[in-house]
Amino acid sequence: MLCLPVFIILLLLASPAAPNPLETRIQRDLIRAALEDADMKTNERFLEGVISTIKDFAGKVCCSVSVNFCCPTA
C-alpha cells in the first residue's frame, strides 16, 4: 500500500518532463526550413543582368534630360 503514493508522486513528476511530440516536430521543421532558406543563393548572372538593365535605362533617361552632365562625350 505504501508503493501506491510513491508511484503516484513519481508519475506526477515525470509527466510534465515528457516532451510534447507535436511541439518538437514543429520546432524541428522550423529549424530545417530556416537552414534551407539560409542555404539559398541569388543567381549572380541574373543579378548582373538586372543591374546592367538599370544602368542602361538610367543612362538613357539622364541623357534625355541633360546631355552635358550625364552623357560621356564621344
Curated annotation (Swiss-Prot):
Record's keyword annotation contains Secreted: yes
Domain of life of the native organism: Eukaryota
Pfam families, sorted: Conotoxin (PF02950)
Keywords from the UniProt entry: Disulfide bond, Neurotoxin, Secreted, Signal, Toxin
Transmembrane stretches, start-end: none
Any one annotated GO CC term: extracellular region
Tissue and organ distribution: Expressed by the venom duct.
Family: Belongs to the conotoxin T superfamily.
Domain notes from UniProt: The cysteine framework is V (CC-CC).
Protein name, entry field: Conotoxin TsMLCL-04
